[in-house]
Amino acid sequence: MKTNELKRLVARKVVDYINPGSVIGIGTGSTVSYFIEVLSTIKNLISGAVSSSNFSTACLKRIGIPIYDLSKINSLVLYIDSADEINPQLQMIKGGGAALTREKIIAATAEKFICIADESKQVEILGKVPLPIEIIPMARSYISNEIIKIGGMPKYRKNVITDNGNVIIDVFNLVITDPVCLENKINSFPGVVSVGLFATRKADIALIGTSSGVQVIY
């Protein structure tokens, strides 16, 4: 099966985990876009959504899904998002779409976090893809130097401003053997808004699209 077909497969499967009438959190990315397509055919299943990005918000509004402000709802039962990489412990690298900070906030709020991805995103050790860091613009040089000290190769993501008005540094050349430790270390640098390691708050369930069907990992 082609990658896009695998993404559609998990996008359809995750519907089984939605409580009818609930407000759900929705992330950002190509696999999530397929999930939003699925929602367009069953939009009465949910009451509305909390969105992690302006892009996803626009897509959801286009199909008539009400958008809720996270700060104005009492609880969020479910958050559905994709990943750039995911390891066997369900820790992830996310942020290729520059929405990592809002994704982290929604993930931290949700009772359950389901990651939907195709099998190409599975790795034993995180770090094959660059690790995004959202930073305050004036901290760019400082944080780049700190990243070099820990063995990373920082690269400024040109022509990208996040929905929060910040910039992104992508970090190459990392072999992330202790994701929680690295997440905490990078978050401690002044000027870091958020790092795209989802290790402390990892996924609760992963639905992985494979050529033999959907693999469910807890």
UniProtKB/Swiss-Prot annotation:
**Which pathway is it part of?**
Carbohydrate degradation; pentose phosphate pathway; D-ribose 5-phosphate from D-ribulose 5-phosphate (non-oxidative stage): step 1/1
Q: Which terms under GO biological process does the entry name?
A: D-ribose metabolic process; pentose-phosphate shunt, non-oxidative branch
Q: Which domain of life is it from?
A: Bacteria
Cross-referenced CDD domains: RPI_A
Binding residues for substrate, per the UniProt record? T28, G29, S30, T31, D81, S82, A83, D84, K94, G95, G96, G97, K121
Q: State which Enzyme Commission number(s) the record gives.
A: 5.3.1.6
Taken from the UniProt record, the cysteine pairs bridged by disulfide bonds within this chain are none
The family database entries (InterPro entries) matched by this protein are listed as: NagB/RpiA_transferase-like, Ribose5P_isomerase_typA_subgr, Ribose5P_isomerase_type_A
Q: Does the keyword ATP-binding feature in the UniProt annotation?
A: no
Give coiled-coil spans as residue ranges. none
Task: Cite the active-site annotation.
Answer: E103 (proton acceptor)
Q: Which reaction does it catalyse?
A: aldehydo-D-ribose 5-phosphate = D-ribulose 5-phosphate
| One GO CC term on file | cytosol
**What are the transmembrane regions?**
none
* Molecular-function GO terms, alphabetical: ribose-5-phosphate isomerase activity
Fetch the Gene3D superfamilies from UniProt: 3.30.70.260, 3.40.50.1360
Ordered alphabetically, the record's keywords are: Isomerase
Q: Which PANTHER family match?
A: RIBOSE-5-PHOSPHATE ISOMERASE (PTHR11934:SF0)
State the protein's purpose: Catalyzes the reversible conversion of ribose-5-phosphate to ribulose 5-phosphate.
Question: HAMAP family, alphabetically?
Answer: Rib_5P_isom_A
Q: How does it assemble?
A: Homodimer.
**Family that this chain belongs to:** Belongs to the ribose 5-phosphate isomerase family.
- Which protein is depicted? Ribose-5-phosphate isomerase A
Native organism: Buchnera aphidicola subsp. Baizongia pistaciae (strain Bp)
Gene, per the UniProt record: rpiA
